[in-house]
Regions:
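His/Asp/Glu-rich metal-coordinating catalytic cores
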Residues: 10-177, 181-184
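Short acidic, S/G/P-rich loop/turn micro-motifs used as interaction or catalytic elements
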Residues: 7, 84, 118, 239-244
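Intrinsic structural disorder
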Residues: 1, 27-31, 107, 215-217, ...
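Accessory, non-catalytic peripheral segments of nucleic-acid enzymes
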Residues: 185-254
Length: 254
């Protein structure tokens, strides 16, 4: 399940579109179905067909962002595309109808949203957990970039944010693990298990200009055993800085 922001921009380059298509095709060829909704990064401000629709039309993945529940292998899945905060009040009835439509369904019920929940991030919050339909057994969430899972007494299942699968420019460079959730629904409860991805390491270092050579040595030691070349950010402070000296030191990292 892709909970929105399949791409980082509404108009990704051709390589990204093909790579994603090939990956979804591989899933399909191995009898693994996938589902997706749209996040704000998938939706252009200019009215045009979102790129991910290509995968739905080709049969590689199924679009479920229209709020209509579908039954799949004994599971009920429903999703909604990104809702702007200013439009949230219009969706109260939609949430209520979703709740009623799945209430008597005996199997697991999954709701896919691309929203910020205030209890997870008060600055990015667009709705409270109490605003959500209460009868779903798993809430697959997109939008927030950090991993987090919470269970609330008023909901029948956990709210799970796997976060982004790669650091983005808005997050800056930091040492953080990325991954996704594999959810066990063999029992009455949905149990998310964290699967860590082998992403490219990213490090940020602060140094005084006079200590740059020493800092570069420390960086070389830190990254010497990595299998993937990392992304390195070096913040340098000082006076009478010579750019040639900086370039010579940074070149040691190549």
């Amino acid at each position: 399940i892709f909970a929105g922001d399949i791409f980082h921009v509404p108009n990704p380059n051709g390589t990204a579109i093909v790579q994603m298509g090939n990956a979804l095709k591989r899933l399909k060829e191995n009898n693994i179905d996938s589902f997706f909704i749209l996040g704000e990064h998938d939706i252009s401000r200019i009215r045009t067909t979102p790129i991910p629709y290509i995968y739905h039309n080709l049969g590689f993945s199924k679009y479920i962002g229209n709020g209509k529940p579908i039954e799949y292998k004994g599971i009920m899945i429903a999703g909604l595309d990104k809702i702007r905060k200013t439009e949230m009040s219009q969706y109260e009835e939609t949430f209520s109808n979703l709740d009623k439509s799945v209430e008597k369904f005996a199997g697991h019920k999954i709701l896919v949203l691309h929203q910020g929940i205030t209890e997870f991030n008060k600055y990015a919050g667009e709705l409270q957990s109490t605003d959500l339909p209460k009868n779903f057994t798993y809430y697959a969430m997109g939008h927030l970039h950090d991993k987090d899972v919470k269970q609330f007494n008023h909901l029948k299942g956990p709210i799970a944010y796997p976060g982004s699968i790669e650091l983005t420019t808005s997050e800056g460079i930091k040492e953080i693990k990325k991954g996704f959730f594999e959810v066990d629904i063999s029992g009455d409860k949905a149990v998310p298990k964290w699967i860590e991805l082998d992403t490219r390491p990213q490090f940020s270092f602060d140094t005084e200009y006079q200590e740059l050579s020493k800092t570069i040595e420390q960086i070389i030691e830190k990254i010497s055993n990595l299998t993937k070349k990392p992304i390195i950010e070096v913040k340098i402070q000082g006076e009478e800085i010579e750019t040639d000296q900086i370039q010579a030191q940074i070149a040691r990292l190549n």
